[in-house]
Regions:
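Active-site catalytic microenvironments in core metabolic enzymes, especially phosphate/sugar-handling
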Residues: 1-238
Length: 238
């Protein structure tokens, strides 16, 4: 099986043409005709990730975030990114990134968050023109929960003791919106769609004021919101 076979398979759930314009997705390093000996799935391609791939004899890394994001003018190992890229090249390890192509997938990052939270009847929060792709998801809890109980449930679900949240509204939690990664841009959409709670990451201080008592905003952390992406990719590839 070649890298192209794997990339074609990944593009069935995360077509590259549905990635955001600013992003850098697809095969970043390597030749698509290369035979795949082993695949390492990761959230970020760190130097330790490449070392692990070498140790485990994996010549393809499937990463959520792209190690090459804004472009490189030189690859001489002077910066961290260059060092990682150079090590991958020297060891004939290809790197493929999905990032916002998977973010915009109906079965992508936010869908996995819904699954972990046990939401039902969920659909895309910010659908694109085709209606089948877009950022975030919104769905229902099987049973309503008190906000305090939902906050505890959220911490447990995302395996963290530290979350940030806006002032509780005093309402029961029925409808929940989620968006993996940085999601402050969708706060107004979550409110418009009558979500009781919006879970995402990287909210700034003043973003919490946008709740205006209409919604409970929860910032679980960037990594925490995307941590299940590895599971999603492994499940799809195996």
């Amino acid at each position: 099986m070649t890298i192209k076979n794997i990339s074609d398979y990944l593009e069935e759930i995360a077509p590259l043409n549905q990635a955001e314009d600013f992003d850098n997705v697809g095969l970043l390093i390597g030749n698509e005709t290369t035979e795949v000996e082993g695949i390492l799935v990761t959230l970020d391609t760190l130097e330790e990730t490449v070392d692990e791939a070498i140790k485990k004899k994996c010549n393809l890394i499937v990463s959520f975030h792209p190690i090459i994001f804004s472009g490189l003018k030189k690859i001489n190992g002077n910066s961290y990114v260059e060092k990682v890229v150079l090590k991958a090249i020297q060891n004939n390890i290809a790197i493929y990134a999905t990032h916002t192509a998977l973010d915009n997938s109906k079965v992508g990052v936010s869908s996995k968050m819904c699954e972990k939270l046990g939401l039902i009847n969920y659909n895309i929060l910010l659908p694109k023109e085709d209606g089948n792709t877009g950022m975030g998801m919104i769905g229902d809890l099987p049973k309503p929960m008190q906000e305090e109980d939902f906050l505890k449930f959220t911490k447990k679900t995302f395996k963290t003791n530290g979350i940030r949240f806006s002032n509780p509204t005093g309402n029961l939690v029925n409808k929940v919106a989620v968006l993996g990664g940085s999601g402050s841009f969708a706060i107004a959409d979550a409110i418009h769609k009558k979500a009781d709670v919006y879970i995402s990451a990287d909210f700034k201080y003043h973003d919490f004021f946008k709740a205006e008592g209409k919604i409970l905003l929860i910032d679980v952390g960037h990594y925490e919101s995307e941590q299940f992406t590895k599971n999603l990719l492994v499940e799809y590839l195996t």
